[in-house]
């Protein structure tokens, strides 16, 4: 590892990103493509991920495919793994980014919304990580799993009422640590990224509510919100040889929010 390229290049690698039709999912896919990985972009909106995949392939000279799938369905998980393997080869970088963030007062929170948060934010990442890890173990190949959590995996929200989101992201952060311990011996490194307040299609509505943006900036030491592309460096680091002795970690990309 005597050059910058050898540390961070992902050429010859194959990544899969869920929730890749918008927001940070697109940025995660861009990060892998910039570093040279072939990628499968997964989301329920197949038309969008297919279009984004074509753009990434043209811009970065990588293979990229879009797959329409619901990550809470076992049959869809099996299908997306098969389609990715057929088009690109076996996945050795998984980015579990798909998520939902239902809001509501805890005392009135609906069971259906609670169950959906668990299914999308916790169960789906585990089921997909299982599938990727089994194949890596079977073939004796190393790999990387990156789970997207949140600042609310470790602190409560003073801006939103996010009981289900906070609980599931905290669970995913600790699942990250557990999988890191169990799979380290196979060369499968499992880490997480905890983004702070970053405007995306999913978050811009809440940020735009009166007073919210100012409060968020005030609570952040850097005194500004993040930019979507600022997630890319952490993704490339955790997917590449640069993080070869890093597993079980949660990397904050939050402008210092959790450093208070």
Residue ranges of each PLM-predicted region?
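Short C-terminal tail/terminal secondary-structure segment
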Residues: 2-7, 236, 247-260
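Conserved glycine-rich cofactor-binding loop
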Residues: 21-23
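The beta1-alpha1 cofactor-binding region of Rossmann-like NAD(H)/NADP(H)-dependent oxidoreductases
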Residues: 46-47, 68-79, 111, 229-230
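Short, small/polar-rich loop/turn modules that mediate ligand/substrate recognition or access, typified
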Residues: 95, 184, 189, 246-248
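Substrate-binding pocket helix/loop in short-chain dehydrogenase/reductase
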Residues: 105-106, 110-118, 216
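Active-site helix of classical SDR
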Residues: 129, 168, 176
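Alpha-helical segment proximal to the catalytic Tyr-Lys
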Residues: 134, 181-185, 244
């Amino acid at each position: 590892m005597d050059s910058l390229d050898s540390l961070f290049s992902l050429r010859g690698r194959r990544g899969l990103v869920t929730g890749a039709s918008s927001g940070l999912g697109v940025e995660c896919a861009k990060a892998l493509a910039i570093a040279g990985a072939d990628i499968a972009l997964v989301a329920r909106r197949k038309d969008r991920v297919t279009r984004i995949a074509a753009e990434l392939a043209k811009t970065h000279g990588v293979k990229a495919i879009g797959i329409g799938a619901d990550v809470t369905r076992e049959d869809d998980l099996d299908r997306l793994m098969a389609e990715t393997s057929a088009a690109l080869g076996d996945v050795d970088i998984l980015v579990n980014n798909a998520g939902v963030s239902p809001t509501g007062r805890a005392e009135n929170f609906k069971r259906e919304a609670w169950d959906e948060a668990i299914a999308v934010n916790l169960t789906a990442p585990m089921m997909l990580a299982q599938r990727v890890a089994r194949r890596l173990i079977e073939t004796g190949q190393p790999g990387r799993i990156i789970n997207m959590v949140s600042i609310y995996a470790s602190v409560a929200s003073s801006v939103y009422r996010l009981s289900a989101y906070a609980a599931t992201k905290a669970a995913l952060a600790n699942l990250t640590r557990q999988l890191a311990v169990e799979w380290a011996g196979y060369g499968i490194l499992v880490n997480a990224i905890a983004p702070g307040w970053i405007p995306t299609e999913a978050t811009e509505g809440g940020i735009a509510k009166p007073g919210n943006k100012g409060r968020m900036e005030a609570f952040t030491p850097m005194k500004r919100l993040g930019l979507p592309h600022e997630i890319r460096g952490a993704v490339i680091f955790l997917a590449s040889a640069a993080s070869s002795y890093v597993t079980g970690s949660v990397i904050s990309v939050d402008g210092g929010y959790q450093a208070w």
